[in-house]
Each structure stands twice: as C-alpha cells, then as structure tokens.
C-alpha cells in the first residue's frame, strides 16, 4: 500500500510539473507583451517570443505569401482555368442581366455619373467644337475643308442635277398650272406696256399668246444647248462656292443661326435616346459580346498579373498589416487556430511528466531497498 501511494504521488508530481512546464512555455510564446525591467536590467525571456519577433514574423509572413501562397503563376493558372472562365462568364452575365432589366434611362445613368443635364452638356460640347473649328478654319476656302471625294461626287453630280431640274421644269410648264402661270405672266407684261400691250392684244385677237410661247419653252428645255448652258452655269457657281472662305459662308448664313440650328439638331438627335432605358439600347450588343469580353479581360489580366502584383507590393501590404496587429490580437488569432494542439502539447507534457515520475519513483524505491 505504501509503495502504491508513493508511486502515485511521484506520478502526480511529475505530471503536474510536465504539464505546467509546457503550459508555461506556450504562454511564454506571447507573454509578457512588453519587456520587464528590474533595477534597470531587462529580465530574461521578456517580452515573449512572438512580441519580440513580431517585425521578423511580419516580414517572413509577407515573403511567404508572395513566394509560396499568392504567386503570379498560381493566379495565372486560375485565370486560365476553363472552369473558372465559365464561372466568371456566368456570374458576369447574371449581374449584367440584372442591370439590363433596369428601367433607368440613359439620362438617369448619366446624371448618376455626374452629368446633371446631358442635353445641355451635348449642346455645349457641340457649340464648343463649332467655335474651335471656326477659329482654326475660318480663313480657309471650302475646297480645303470639304473632303476630296465629296468634291468629286458633287462635280460629277451636276449634269444629273441639271437633267432633273429640266425635267421638273418641262413637267410644270406642260401642266395646266404651268399654262395658267405663263398666261398670267404674259398678261401682266402686256398690261405693264400700256398702249403697246393693248395694240399687241388687239392684233392677236382671240389667239392665246401663252399657247404659242409654251411649246417653244418646252422645246428649249429639251434642247442640248439648254442643258449645256445650265450645266456650265452650275459649274461656274459651284467653283465660286468652293473658293469661298469659311467666314464668308458664316456671314451669309449668320453665326448665331448656325449655332442655334446645330443645337436644335443635336437636341433632336440626343433627346430620344436619352429617354430610353439604357439596357434596351445596349442589350443585344452586350449579350452577344459579353462572353468574348470576359475571356479577353481574363487573358489581359493573366498576361499582366505579375507586373500588377509587383506594383501592388503585396509583401509590404502583408508585412504592414501583420506589424499593425496588437500582440493580443496575434495571440487570439494563433490560439483560435491552434488552441486544440496547444492543449494536446500540455497534456503530452503532463503524460511525459507522469511517466518520468513513475520511473523516478521506481528507481528511488529499489535504490532504498
């Protein structure tokens, strides 16, 4: 009975010492948080290991994250992974679809992004561009401003324009309205000539002068000479127009009228799209091009991920974040992860201490015999 109690006592003492030693060693990883001084001398093992090595720990964690955990190659593999590309495409499509279903108009979206009056902004922009254009080209002739191909098209279009004009004139003159108009003009002309006009009307009697003149006018309009005359007239006038300087055109039309006309044109063009839901305007194009756009962006990111990571200085970010943690927070984080393992270490120390106590008790007992 005495031997059993003696050995039990040695086991308990050994287990207590072993458990307390390991528990104290674990606590000394974190505590004390700050160095302790007595008579101006720092006590050994103060502060604890982690508070003492916090800067070094932060540096090593930052290096470990960049070199072994969050590497450019690992991110590149993830970005190029077909399943990840498909997941990202599906996610973006879902989010964009929500946006496309929105009833918010283009004007509302523009206002949200800092454009309080899109219509006025467009008008102001057009007016500014007009004034800038005029300040640069006011002294230059039209033929230097209008594109060459447009000038050539107008040059070649003059004969066809003349043909259409002559056709319209012949059609009008051959109509009843044209006949009445010619007769009215002849009567006004004869009346303006006084006695000579009256004598001419008496000489003609009941014969209508308009009926005699109208066929000759039609005949003239059908002649090649009339066409060549008008073509040459149009060409001469067009050459004069091409030589006109921009400021001359501006004076003829009036600058203010041009600006007002441009603003009205802008308003008529811009107003309708501004009142439509943005989703309805862009939905067909977005849905069609979205998968290609997602793949392009992921490929773009994959090719530049290493450069971006260097520019982000991830190692410094991790180091600064860890260094900014209080020792209490570091202790809490590590214990949250490893509390069970630390307990097992304490229990292991108690177990080893108990075994050592048992062995020591047995040796002592046999030595004393």
From Swiss-Prot:
It holds the Pfam family DUF445. The chain crosses the membrane at residues 1-21, 347-367. InterPro entries: DUF445, UCP032178. It is found in: Cell membrane. It is a multi-pass membrane protein. Keywords: Cell membrane, Membrane, Transmembrane, Transmembrane helix. GO terms for cellular component: plasma membrane. PANTHER family: UPF0754 MEMBRANE PROTEIN YHEB. Belongs to the UPF0754 family. This is UPF0754 membrane protein Aflv_2299.
């Amino acid at each position: 009975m005495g031997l059993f109690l003696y050995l039990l006592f040695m086991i308990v003492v050994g287990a207590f010492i072993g458990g307390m030693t390991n528990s104290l060693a674990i606590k000394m990883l974190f505590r004390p948080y700050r160095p302790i001084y007595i008579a101006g001398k720092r006590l050994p093992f103060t502060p604890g290991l982690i508070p003492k090595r916090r800067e070094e720990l932060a540096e090593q964690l930052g290096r470990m994250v960049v070199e072994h955990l969050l590497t450019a190659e690992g991110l590149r593999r993830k970005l190029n992974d077909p399943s990840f590309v498909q997941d990202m495409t599906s996610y973006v499509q879902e989010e964009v679809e929500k946006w496309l279903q929105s009833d918010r108009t283009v004007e509302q979206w523009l206002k949200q992004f800092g454009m309080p009056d899109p219509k006025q902004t467009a008008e102001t922009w057009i007016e500014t561009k007009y004034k800038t254009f005029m300040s640069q080209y006011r002294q230059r002739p039209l033929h230097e401003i209008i594109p060459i191909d447009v000038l050539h098209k107008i040059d070649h279009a003059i004969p066809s324009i003349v043909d259409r004009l002559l056709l319209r004139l012949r059609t009008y003159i051959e109509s009843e309205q044209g006949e009445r108009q010619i007769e009215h003009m002849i009567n006004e002309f004869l009346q303006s000539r006084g006695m000579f006009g009256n004598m001419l009307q008496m000489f003609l009697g009941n014969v209508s002068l308009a009926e005699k003149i109208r066929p000759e006018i039609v005949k003239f309009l059908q002649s090649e000479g009339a066409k060549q005359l008008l073509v040459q007239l149009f060409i001469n006038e067009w050459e004069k127009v091409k030589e006109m300087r921009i400021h001359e055109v501006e004076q003829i039309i009036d600058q203010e009228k041009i600006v007002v006309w441009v603003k009205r044109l802008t308003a008529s063009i811009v107003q309708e799209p501004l009142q439509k839901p943005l989703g309805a305007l862009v939905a067909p194009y977005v849905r069609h091009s979205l998968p290609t756009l997602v793949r392009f962006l992921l490929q773009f990111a994959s090719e530049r991920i290493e450069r971006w990571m260097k520019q982000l200085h991830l190692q410094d970010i991790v180091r600064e974040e860890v260094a900014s943690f209080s020792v209490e927070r570091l202790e809490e984080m590590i214990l949250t992860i490893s509390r069970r393992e630390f307990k097992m270490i304490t229990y292991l120390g108690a177990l080893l201490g108990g075994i050592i106590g048992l062995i020591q008790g047995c040796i002592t007992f046999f030595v004393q015999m």
